[in-house]
Structure formats: C-alpha cells, structure tokens
Amino acid sequence: MGKQKADYLLRSDHIFTSTVENPFAGYVAVSGQNILAVGTDDGSDWIDEQTEVLELGDQLVTPGFIDVHTFFTGYAIFHIGIDMSGITSQEEFLQKIKEQVEKEKEPSTVFGHGWNPNGFETEGLEEKLNEAYSDRAVIVFAADRSTCMMNRKAEEAYGFNPKECYPEAYHKIMPEYLNDRDFIEPEFKDYMKLMNSRGVTTVKEMGFDDFYGFDSFLKEKEEKKELSLRTFFMSQPVGEGINIEHGKRMREKFQGDFVRFSGYNRMTDGTVASTKGDLLEPYEGTNMHCSIQVDYPMIEKEVQLADENGFRYSLHAQGDGAVHKVAGIFDKCQKKDGKLVNRHAVTDMEFSNPADLKKMGEIGVTGEIYFQIMSLDPADDVKKSIEETIGTERGKYFWNRRGMLDGGMTLSGATDLPLMI
C-alpha cells in the first residue's frame, strides 16, 4: 500500500506552526480532519489526481486560535428582538414597540436592540411605556449594551434596571432567548462564522449557572456535526452558588471532540480605575483598599469544592490585593510534585505584585489575559488613571505581562467577546 495522499494541499510563503519562532515557505497536507504533514518543499509527494491544491501565496497559514474567554450569551444581546437602530424620536420608538406587540400571538416580553441613547430626548419615555404596557415587560438594549430602556413591569419581572444593565444583573432574561430556537439557531451559526473568520476554532465559553438549557442545544448540534467551533463551556455562579452536581452531569454528558465542560468561573473584584479593584496598599490619597466587598471565604469554599471534585476554577482578579488572595486560594488546592492537579486559572490581572506572579508560576496557575484591552482607552487617559489611583511607582506593575512570563506563568489569550469585537 502506497503512502496516503492528501485531500487538500495548502502551499504558502508564510506557514506558522507555533513550534518554531518564524513563519516559513512550504506546504500543509490535509486528509479529512487530520494534518498528514507539514514541510518546506512543494509537497508534491502528497498529491494525486484527487488532491485539491490551494496556492495561497502571501496568505498566512496557522493553527486555529483558541480564545479562552468568550460570552455568546452576551453577544446575542446585540441582536435580540426589534432592531431599534436609526430611531430618532420617542414617537418612532413607541410605534416600533406597538408594531411588535400587534404581531405577537401570545403576550411575551418585548425585546429590542441597537437603541442610541443620545439619538433623541428620552425624558418621559419610561412613563409612556408604563402606561401603554402595564401588564407586559419591555426591554430595549442600547447599541453598546451600556444601558437599556425598560418599563416598570420589566424591572419587577427581571430584577434589574437601566443603571444596572450588565449580564450578571439581567441573567433572568437569558433562559428566554437561549431557548428561543427561531432566534438562537441563526445567532449561534453567525457567531461561529464570526469566530472562524478571525481564525478562532476553539473557545472557552461562559455560561451562567446551569446554562439555562443551552447545553442541550450544544449537544444536539454536536451530534448532528453542525459545529465549526469547539466549545469548552464553564459554569459561572450568578443566580445561585456553585452547582457541583450540574458540573458532574455536564462532564458525563460531553465526552466528544467538539464540546466539553471545562469547570467554573467567578468574578472577584473590579477595575482599579473604578476603585473596585482590591489593592494590597490603599488607593492614592485615601485609606481605602477597595470600594466593594468581596466574599473571599465563600470563593475559597467554592474553589476547594470544585478542586475536590476534579474541576478547574477560573477567578477574575484585577487589583494586586485580589491577585494575592487568589494566589493564596489556589495554593491550598491539590498538588502533585508541587504543581496543581487541576488547571486553575486567574483572569485579567490588571495590576499585580511580582511575588504573587512567581508563586502562581511555581504551582502552575494559568493566566487568561485580555491582550487587546490596552487598546480600549486612549493612552493618556490610562496613564492619568494610573497616576490618580495607584501612582507611578506602583503603576509600573500595571498590565505586567512581562512579569507574568518571567514568573513562569503560562499565558493564554482572550477577547472577552463581545467586549473586544
């Protein structure tokens, strides 16, 4: 029997395997879902009359990227319900709502997206929604999800308001749209297409609590071989505490190549700029270490429970105080030969102490980093914020990616999609 031939042969002047430092000219031979060979010649030994040869020239060929923190559930909010972009008056806004209500056979929450809060004067609009729809919830999200317009019925039903319009606050609406097949089927297909178009083939996906039934959707798509995005999903306790039994069920349910349960995820503190970051030393000119309360004992209990049951835990920590406490929590977890048995991770690490980075490197904590986050705000604004909150001396440890690597940590890249898209 002769050597197996390729279904596809990709030739490029720039092939990056990630196992060598620089790209090189050559080929990649592919059969089915398997890479047969990678080489620096023309790959002709792998070709027969059935092989499709792709001459890619200057185009880069690289392994698929892994995005270690994505949030499809939040991405979908950009497209939920009525498209309210382009609305320029309260009259248009109310007319759109009215038209949607008249279309629906059964009374349900009216959702909308794309609203521009600065597009027209909104004073009195909430009262008009209350009068017109006293028995029906109405929620229209701003184009950037920073706020929303909603009536009293919606606030009562879902337990949040326009001043607290963020995913953890509006988690009660998620079961509705995640189980709306007419909406979620095309939405997830577009999401996979978007990620694939950026070279992403695998994601670590955030799902609140028990994912509100969305795991059944993923299972169905996996069995039908309709997934182009490998999905390792996590449970983030929001409406309830850690649900270990759910994790056990998901671990048993997903054993294939495309979907797996990856463990648990939780926030600790907030950003340093907002003074919600937990600091080892007080904020400049104050006696305050953190403007919010963080329940570290509860977090430690959850991490220990997850660790005992063979699950990993990702903790978000932004201030150096939070990073220090997270390092201490992980240091108490199971180890073998000095390294963590379960691959726990710390996310973001906006501001950190080099000693804690070294400690985490020694025990094998992975860093999940939003590498693009430095591009969100103008450089001068960031510098000013650092000077005002922690000062220039401590500021040299802000976004200390070099220190993380020098400390021995393995770093992975995340977009926190939809934040970075």
State where each predicted segment sits.
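Non-cysteine beta-strand/loop elements that form the S-adenosyl-L-methionine
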Residues: 71, 256-276, 365-375
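Phosphate/diphosphate-binding loops
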Residues: 228-262, 343-350, 389-409
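Short acidic/histidine-rich active-site segments
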Residues: 272-275, 311-321, 368-371, 404-421
